[in-house]
């Protein structure tokens, strides 16, 4: 497996990569690629991927299924899809294996957040909901059922998942990923969405 997403435009990967270009996390990754490597490099990568006859899927699970059936060699997915399927069928019954790309735009650690809207600061239900999301019970659910990284210290990540501290994220301010419309246009121009 390559150590960088840049390698995926090589001829050896022609017809061997699956991904879901309409997926929000894939689009966040391409946006990160634009921010980290520049517009020209990102456009060249997207065009190279489009020219490399990829298997375009509706979602990450479909990409994972194509790897597991041997139709492609590699799928660009979020880790938790692999863990969910492994919990259902057993990791030993899966052809697909996970690879994290340290320091590469393909290995960004993205986040999800919750906040209370300005003007709703006194809404007790909104506050209770946000407090619940960061409670031990909810964080254990995210680990055990959705195979996500926990926010609270003292709650272990899902078994088999590298510690979040061990992942090498590229130098990226996630607030710079706001230009989603340009990413979608880039993907559309390449015929991927």
Protein language model regions, located:
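Extracytoplasmic ligand-binding site segments that recognize negatively charged/polar headgroups
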Residues: 1-72, 85
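A bilobed periplasmic-binding-protein/Venus flytrap-type ligand-binding module shared by bacterial periplasmic
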Residues: 34, 110-122, 141
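An extracytoplasmic/periplasmic, membrane-proximal ligand-sensing/linker region
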Residues: 40-41, 148-193
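Substrate/cofactor-recognition hotspot
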Residues: 129
């Amino acid at each position: 497996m390559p150590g960088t997403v840049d390698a995926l435009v090589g001829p050896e990967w022609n017809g061997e990569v699956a991904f879901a270009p309409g997926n929000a996390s894939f689009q966040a990754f391409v946006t990160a690629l634009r921010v980290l490597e520049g517009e020209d490099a990102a456009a060249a990568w997207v065009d190279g991927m489009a020219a490399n006859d990829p298997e375009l899927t509706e979602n990450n699970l479909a990409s994972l299924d194509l790897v597991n059936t041997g139709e492609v060699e590699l799928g660009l997915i979020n880790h938790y899809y692999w863990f969910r399927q492994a919990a259902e069928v057993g990791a030993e019954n899966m052809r697909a294996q996970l690879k994290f790309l340290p320091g590469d735009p393909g290995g960004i650690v993205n986040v999800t957040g919750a906040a209370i809207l300005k003007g709703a600061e006194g809404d007790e239900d909104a506050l209770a909901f946000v407090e619940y999301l960061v409670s031990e019970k909810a964080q254990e659910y995210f680990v055990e059922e959705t195979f996500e990284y926990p926010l609270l210290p003292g709650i272990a990540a899902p078994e088999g998942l590298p510690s979040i501290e061990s992942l090498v994220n590229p130098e990226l301010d996630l607030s710079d990923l706001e230009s989603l419309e340009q990413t979608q246009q880039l993907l559309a121009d390449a015929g991927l969405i």
